[in-house]
Amino acid sequence: MGVPERPTLLLLLSLLLLPLGLPVLCAPPRLICDGRVLERYILEAREAENVTMGCAEGPRLSENITVPDTKVNFNAWKRMEVQEQAVEVWQGLSLLSEAILRGQALLANSSQPSGMLQLHIDKAISGLRSLTSLLRVLGAQKESISPPDATPPAPLRTLMVENFCKLFRVYSNFLRGKLKLYTGEACRRGDR
């Protein structure tokens, strides 16, 4: 019953600090660069999209929610600096997180049956938090902060969704598109 061993103490400390988004000593710094990690989140997003796919008319949101536009002009994307890509991905991920949380609140206040839908919302929230932490370790948050004398980034393009089907489609498309493109490029360049 003495003092815990040092590795155990470090593990406990890292588990406490990880949700805060602080750098953790034990966390593999380039975990997001392992394609299997991102593919797991993409698979969860696709499952949520598929569950709600037959829902052109429902389950509806009681208000429209703003989400990031997921369209990618590949030629323009390739010409962008990694810092510009980081800004777009970081802003998009933040807006998407807000949108999913808003969807969760609207579902909780509705009379719609929510069992399976709530499960996928909870998975999406957990996945977005994990992806945010992994992007922080990769340095996306630092890259998305422009110096005071820099030209401000272009405003994030957005669109409105009115049902959970479209919300999960945007979530899935964002992960498969901009997030995957950014992490692939940042990992290839070795940016941190």
From Swiss-Prot:
Coiled coil: none annotated. GO terms for molecular function: cytokine activity; erythropoietin receptor binding; hormone activity; protein kinase activator activity. This is Erythropoietin. Gene3D superfamilies: 1.20.1250.10. Pfam families: EPO_TPO. Hormone involved in the regulation of erythrocyte proliferation and differentiation and the maintenance of a physiological level of circulating erythrocyte mass. Binds to EPOR leading to EPOR dimerization and JAK2 activation thereby activating specific downstream effectors, including STAT1 and STAT3. GO terms for biological process: erythrocyte maturation; erythropoietin-mediated signaling pathway; positive regulation of cell population proliferation; positive regulation of Ras protein signal transduction. Produced by kidney or liver of adult mammals and by liver of fetal or neonatal mammals. It comes from Alexandromys oeconomus. Glycans are attached at residues 50, 64, 109. Belongs to the EPO/TPO family. The gene is EPO. It is found in: Secreted. Keywords: Disulfide bond, Erythrocyte maturation, Glycoprotein, Hormone, Secreted, Signal. Disulfide bonds join 33-187. GO terms for cellular component: extracellular space. Residues 1-26 form the signal peptide.
